[in-house]
Curated annotation (Swiss-Prot):
It catalyses: L-lysyl-tRNA(Lys) + a 1,2-diacyl-sn-glycero-3-phospho-(1'-sn-glycerol) = a 1,2-diacyl-sn-glycero-3-phospho-1'-(3'-O-L-lysyl)-sn-glycerol + tRNA(Lys). Catalyzes the transfer of a lysyl group from L-lysyl-tRNA(Lys) to membrane-bound phosphatidylglycerol (PG), which produces lysylphosphatidylglycerol (LPG), a major component of the bacterial membrane with a positive net charge. LPG synthesis contributes to bacterial virulence as it is involved in the resistance mechanism against cationic antimicrobial peptides (CAMP) produces by the host's immune system (defensins, cathelicidins) and by the competing microorganisms (bacteriocins). It holds the Pfam family LPG_synthase_C. Belongs to the LPG synthase family. It is found in: Cell membrane. This is Phosphatidylglycerol lysyltransferase. It comes from Staphylococcus epidermidis (strain ATCC 12228 / FDA PCI 1200). It is a multi-pass membrane protein.
Length: 840
């Protein structure tokens, strides 16, 4: 049998053992808990002196400070230049984390290595010392096991009745002398020969502190037994928790304590309550304190230190990966810790709804308590819904949290007025103030998908809250109390109304105060950039007056955009110095992220797609633009006889074409308006992606007109210079609809011939929407659907007709794309673009 196979088999049997043990513990614990009278447990909890409860929680929080002795020994042994106060802070965070998700202490060992390797260049010795600390966590229990075997901590009622307990104690007791002998005989450093002994003493003190906290919890719930006997039961339970490899020994530890104390004639209700208080005091309270400490400890200070540390050596085999992520992870620890604290706060006060309900049942003024219940439930739900926003550093989410904390505090003061909980709310409020000051964005964009998820989550949470309250009332058997059930019936709707009012008012005020700032168009600067660096097929639309412009810091490039429905819709590619496009887009994305807006690019070319891709965008092909090569365009030849026939027809009718250069007279503009109004026939003008029929815009470029034999204007088209590559485009094309003449053909042909005569090389006839989109079965589903629309909905919109019409001019087809950010919906982005185009 190979070594690899042996290792796999060992891992497999370990997994089977751990799984079987876990299932056994769960079923046994369930069987024991099924006999417990939860009403009696709640009654016992109500009798507890609140001062003793505060002292228990304080003791649980302070007990973890003893574990800092491990880190002090480590720092002294390695002679690390690290402030003592920081050692205590870091150690507390590590040990609190290790107690919850320890997996035998390996999580704590990993975090220690991660933190302390930045203070030393001898990582080998660091790992060896951390290994001693990891193993010594068991040696403390080994020492206590020896005392249990010697009956100093008397647990004979368990040892004599359960044979496997005796054998576990003997095995663990033998581990201590072996460990001490090995670490003294073969020390990591001869100058620190007794490192294992020191760590064993700390481990023993640690376990005794934990036993003392549990014993104090037992005394509070009126359990009175010998301390020596209690410690004996605790040691056996701790060993069971370690063997189970379940983080914190959850389940296995509690089951052994429950069975051990039950065998002494103590009621199960008291034991359960003592265990819950112990878990809260020794695990939950330290974690909350650790989260608060981490919001200060890890952040800009740690990030700056890592940037400047000469001892920064990433872990072997993950060098490049860790170097790129370690600093970013540390920088996110404060916001992540605050988000966890907010989530836990909401859960705590959701559970505290039981207190409001219970007090309200025995109070004559039911209505006030139901209002307080609805307010607190609404505030807790609002906290949960904004946890992600707080993690992302959104000021609006933090403001929602501010309001929620104030509402929870008000409900708490009016009802049960717990000093401990009010103190906690004050701490959270202070942390939120600090988070607001360092927030990176004003708000995060809301999307239909996100709103739907939040709605479903709200319904689910409110349903769970209802189940919790109703289940507790049933367990306490309080339905015999006469209450106003109509108020309970409308409690759900009261909560919904309060949430809607809070969200609506704050969102409106926030949007009103931080409305998207208008970047005034400096046409002089735009002209200078276009004249120096050139434009594109859409750059002339900067003069339409319905868009804002965003310039880069050097003022040598800009983009045209318009704000609509929390989105910044950009028209075309950036304009200006191509070397500045990346910095321009980076600044624009930072601006949009701070404001909480989505970014959508409309009608971009494929030239800069790698640049858009770098910003995490997705692409959708809108269609293709028809670009005619004027160097090869001609009306001569057999295939072009249709063009000649059209031109000859206009000549026979004495219809003339001419180009009018600006400035234009008022009479000329009145003629244009007459034709335009007839062509529109009451329809609204389109915006954004086409020019505006205004005297200011039309005066920026020449206009081609067609007149009949009497000199009356019957058609016109406005030109769009591109200011680059000798290309030109056409914008507005309008004619008198009552005339049965191919006026659009006439305008295009005359414009093509005029452009060629003037030396232009290319002519843009515009886009054929959805043309050549999703034609392959390998294409994205959304593009294949768009392709089917192109093929089968020609009656609603002339998709195919537009392409066939432009095909007769033999153009080169260039693709145009819609660019939108990842995690955003294509259809929602398209809808916003259409709203920009259709509405002024």
């Amino acid at each position: 049998m190979t070594q690899e196979l042996k290792s796999k088999l060992l891992s497999f049997f370990k997994f089977i053992f751990a799984t079987a043990l876990f299932i056994f513990v769960i079923f046994t614990l369930y069987r024991e808990l099924s006999h417990i009278n939860f009403k009696e447990t709640f009654i016992q909890f109500g009798k507890i002196n609140r001062l003793w409860l505060v002292l228990l929680f304080a003791g649980g929080g302070l007990s973890l400070i003893l574990l800092s002795l491990y880190d002090i020994i480590l720092v002294k042994a390695l002679k690390l230049k690290m402030p003592l106060i920081r050692v205590f802070r870091v150690s507390y965070i590590i040990n609190a984390l290790n107690s919850i998700i320890g997996f035998g202490g390996f999580i704590g060992a990993g975090v220690r290595a991660f933190v302390y390797k930045n203070y030393t260049n001898d990582t080998k010795k660091l790992v060896q010392y951390i290994s001693i600390i990891l193993v010594s966590m068991l040696t403390g229990l080994s020492l206590l096991s020896i005392l249990v075997v010697l009956r100093i901590f008397n647990a004979s009622h368990m040892i004599d009745e359960i044979s496997w307990v005796r054998w576990i104690l003997y095995i663990v007791a033998l581990f201590l002398p072996i460990f001490i002998f090995y670490t003294v005989a073969r020390p990591v450093d001869r100058n620190n020969r007794y490192m294992g002994v020191y760590c064993t003493v700390v481990s023993c003190v640690e376990w005794m502190a934990a036993a003392t906290v549990l014993y104090f919890a037992a005394l509070i719930v009126d359990i009175h037994i010998s301390f020596m006997t209690f410690v004996g039961i605790f040691v056996i339970a701790a060993l069971s928790g370690l063997v189970s490899f379940i983080p914190g020994g959850f389940g296995a530890f509690d089951l052994v304590v429950l069975l051990g104390l039950k065998s002494l004639g103590i009621s199960e209700e008291k034991i359960l309550l003592a265990l819950v208080l112990y878990r809260f005091a020794y695990y939950f309270v330290p974690v909350m304190i650790a989260l608060i400490l981490s919001s200060f400890e890890f952040g800009n200070t740690a990030k700056k230190y890592l940037d400047n540390s000469k001892y920064f050596i990433p872990v072997k085999d993950f060098t490049s990966f860790l170097r790129s992520y370690q600093k970013d992870i540390l920088a996110k620890v404060p916001s992540f810790s605050l988000a966890i604290l907010i989530f836990l706060t909401s859960i705590i006060f959701f559970i505290n709804n039981l207190t409001i309900v219970y007090d309200g049942l025995y109070d004559g003024n039911h209505f006030a308590y139901y209002i307080a219940l609805a307010v607190q439930t609404s505030a807790c739900l609002l906290l949960i819904l904004n946890v992600r926003g707080i993690y992302k550093g959104s000021r609006r989410a933090i403001i929602y949290a501010f309001i929620s904390i104030i509402l929870i505090a008000s409900a708490t003061i009016y009802t049960y007025a717990s000093f401990l909980l009010l103190s906690w709310l004050i701490i959270i409020f202070v942390l939120l103030i600090l988070a607001y000051q360092r927030a990176q964005v004003l708000k995060r964009p809301l999307r239909f998908k996100k709103l739907a998820v939040m709605l479903l989550l709200s319904i689910f949470i409110l349903y769970l809250n209802h189940i919790l309250i109703s289940g507790t009332l049933y367990a306490l058997d309080v339905y015999h109390i006469e209450i106003d059930t109509s108020l309970l019936r409308y409690y759900f709707w009261m909560t919904i109304v309060i949430i809607m009012l809070l969200v609506g008012v704050i969102a409106w005020l926030f949007d009103y105060k931080y409305k998207c700032p208008h970047h005034s168009i400096d046409l002089t600067l735009c002209d200078a950039i276009i004249q120096k660096y050139g434009g594109n097929y859409l750059s002339h639309l900067v003069y339409s007056g319905d868009k804002d412009c965003f310039f880069n810091e050097n003022k040598d490039s800009f983009i045209m955009y318009r704000y609509k429905s929390n989105a910044l819709v950009v028209l075309g590619d950036p304009i200006g110095n191509t070397k500045s496009f990346e910095s321009l887009l980076e600044a624009f994305y930072q601006f949009a992220e701070y404001q909480g807006y989505e970014i959508i690019f409309y009608q971009i070319s494929d030239q800069y797609m790698p640049l858009y891709h770098n910003f995490g965008n997705q692409f959708f092909k809108l269609g293709e633009e028809a670009i005619i090569d004027l160097t090869t365009f001609t009306t001569s030849g057999k295939k072009r006889r249709g063009f000649r026939a059209t031109l000859n027809k206009f000549d026979d009718l004495n219809i003339n074409f001419e180009i009018i250069e600006p400035p234009f007279t008022q009479d000329f503009f009145d003629e244009l308006k007459f034709v335009s109004d007839k062509w529109l026939d009451g329809r609204s003008e389109m915006h954004f992606s086409v020019g505006q029929f205004t005297q200011t815009y039309l005066s920026k470029a020449p206009i081609g007109v067609m007149r009949d034999h009497s000199g009356k204007m019957i058609a016109f088209c406005s030109l769009m210079p591109t200011y680059s590559n000798n290309a030109i485009s056409v914008d507005l094309i309008r004619w008198l609809p009552e005339l049965d003449l191919p006026l659009m053909d006439g305008l295009y042909l005359h414009m093509l011939l005029w452009s060629k005569e003037k030396g232009y090389k290319a002519f843009n006839m515009g886009m054929a929407t959805l043309s050549n989109v999703g034609q392959l079965h390998y294409s994205y589903l959304r593009e294949r659907m768009a392709g089917r629309v192109f093929e089968h909905f020609n009656g609603l919109y002339r998709f195919q007709g537009l392409r066939r019409y432009k095909e007769k001019y033999s153009p080169n087809w260039e693709p145009r794309f819609l660019v939108y950010q990842k995690h955003y919906s294509l259809w929602e982005s398209m809808l916003k673009v259409m709203r920009v185009i259709r509405h002024k």
